[in-house]
């Protein structure tokens, strides 16, 4: 039950109670006592997202069991964590779900339907992985996530593609099939959520001294780290010239051994940026942080 519900239920009870007293006693002055409770209910209804966020951020709860099971089934990084860090991971994912907007495109016939929980979870899991070692629980300038039923065109990129980042509006767009494929087929598949949120991280959260200086000459090394060539990644995204920091983020979490072997300096910078060393599978956090 959401925290705001604990306020509205008693208020509704007392409002109904006073209306009932007024009705059965034929004395409608009693109905006036219901007015404050109705006003409180209306205020809580309008402010419920903010109330729920404030309460749960101070007392974070882990994901519901069915979502945690889905996470444990598919997320390799999560499976290897210590029990304490699994709990932290779960809480960060839950807070990310609560603190961001997930919606369908206006052109979708099912626009009014809610985005399925598993699709939202895939994005939240990528965010929790990236932010596990940091105090942040979301990306301040990016709080809108659009899930399209298939590949999509946009005014910026008219061809069909699977993911895109709109920095100006703080929106990240994904196609649902590619999002699910990347999550359920890891590490063989390229995970779009990790890629795009890695881009978000380095454009909003990371300090400049922790951002590696990658250039296109290092594509061959990135390919050797993952066995994913540039063409494969481009076909997954649906756009040419993938962002190198997004690709590096993906490979850092999925192929840490080869990453450290082939690009040790970049690996260390990423460890500093994320405050994580994925080579230490059970406890990758370098310096402990408060949630």
Please identify what each model-predicted range represents.
Residues 175-194:
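Short pre-active-site segment immediately N-terminal to the catalytic Zn-binding motif
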Residues 150, 177-179, 206:
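An acidic- and aromatic-residue-enriched active-site/binding cleft used to recognize and process polar
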Residues 97-100, 201-205:
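A generic secondary-structure signal for well-formed alpha-helical elements
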Residues 100-173, 182-183:
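Auxiliary, metal-adjacent structural segments of Zn-dependent hydrolase domains
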Residues 193-202:
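Active-site His/Glu-centered metal-binding helix of metallohydrolases
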Residues 103, 207-208:
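Short, polar/charged, Gly/Pro-enriched helix-capping and turn/loop motifs at alpha-helix termini
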Residues 2-4, 120-131, 152, 158-161, ...:
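Metalloprotease/metallohydrolase-associated module, dominated by Zn2+-dependent proteases
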Residues 1-128, 132-133, 276-291:
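N-terminal low-structure segments adjacent to metalloprotease catalytic domains
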């Amino acid at each position: 039950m959401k925290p705001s519900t604990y306020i509205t239920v008693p208020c509704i009870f007392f409002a109904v109670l006073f209306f009932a007293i007024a009705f059965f006693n034929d004395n409608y002055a009693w109905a006036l006592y219901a007015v404050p409770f109705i006003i409180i209910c209306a205020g809580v209804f309008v402010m419920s997202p903010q109330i729920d966020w404030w309460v749960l951020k101070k007392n974070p709860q882990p994901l519901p069991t069915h979502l945690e099971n889905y996470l444990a089934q598919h997320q390799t990084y999560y499976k290897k964590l210590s029990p304490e860090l699994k709990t932290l991971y779960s809480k960060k994912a839950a807070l990310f779900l609560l603190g961001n907007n997930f919606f369908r495109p206006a052109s979708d016939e099912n626009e009014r339907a809610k985005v399925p929980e598993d699709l939202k979870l895939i994005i939240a899991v990528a965010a929790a992985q990236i932010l596990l070692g940091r105090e942040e629980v979301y990306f301040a300038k990016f709080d809108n996530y659009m899930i399209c039923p298939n590949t999509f065109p946009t005014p910026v990129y008219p061809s069909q593609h699977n993911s895109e980042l709109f920095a100006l509006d703080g929106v990240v767009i994904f196609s649902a099939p590619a999002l699910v494929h990347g999550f359920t087929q890891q590490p063989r598949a390229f995970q779009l959520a990790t890629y795009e949120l890695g881009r978000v991280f380095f454009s909003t959260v990371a300090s400049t001294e922790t951002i590696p200086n990658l250039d296109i000459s290092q594509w061959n090394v990135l390919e050797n780290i993952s066995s994913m060539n540039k063409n494969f990644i481009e076909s997954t995204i649906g756009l040419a010239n993938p962002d190198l920091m997004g690709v590096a983020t993906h490979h850092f979490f999925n192929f840490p051994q080869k990453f450290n072997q082939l690009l040790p300096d970049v690996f260390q910078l990423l460890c500093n940026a994320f405050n994580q060393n994925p080579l230490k599978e059970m406890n990758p956090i370098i310096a402990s942080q408060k949630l």
